C-alpha cells in the first residue's frame, strides 16, 4: 500500500536500518500502536479529511487486499470467488468529484494479494505482487507486470523472481514485495523458522533485482497479529497487522 494512510486495527513496526548484510540479522527498534476498536474513529475537529461522496464500485465483490497508485491511477487488488489463487485488479482514474474511468485485469493462480505495489521507470508503471501459488503456499515467487486492460495473466507476470533466504539459500514461500518511493529498492517479506524476514534489494530500471544478493536482511520475532501488508519508505519498513476476525 502506498504512503501515509491511517488504518484501523494496526500494529506499526518502525524498523531502523543499520549495517546489516546477508549473513547477519539486523538489530531493530520496534514501535507499536494498537487500536482496540472495530469502527473507524471520528476525525478530529482540526482534521482536513472529509468523506464527501462515494465514487465507484470495484470490479470484484470481495474485500480489498491491497492497493497502490502512480501519478495517474489507483490500482486495487481483490480475490475473486470462488477463491483458488485468482485475483482481479481494478484500475481507477478520477476525473473530478463523482467522475471516473474504471477497468480491470485478472491474475489467475497468483495467490492471496497480501501486497500490491508499483515501480515507475522511464514513465512506465510496473505492478508487483506475489505469484505462482500452490496449495497452502499462497505465493512462491514475486511478479512484476504492466497493467493491461481486460488482460488475463496466468501463474506469474512478465518478470518473476523466486526468493532464496540469504543465509540458508533455500527458496522461500509466502513472499510479498514492496517498493520504495523512488523505485530504487524492493523489500521482500517472508516467514521462516518461526520468524519473519525482510530482504532489501537494489532495484534497477524499476524491474530488475538480483534475488541472491540482498543488500540487507532483517529478522523479527513472530508477532501475535495477523499480517496484512507492509511498505518500504526511506530507511523504514511499516507493517500492518490485525486480528483475523476484527480487522476491517
Model-derived features with residue positions:
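Beta-propeller domains
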Residues: 32-56, 65-108, 245-248
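Asp-box/WD-like beta-propeller blade repeats and closely related beta-sheet repeat scaffolds
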Residues: 46-52, 140-179
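Loop/turn-rich, solvent-exposed surfaces of beta-rich toroidal or solenoidal domains
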Residues: 220-248
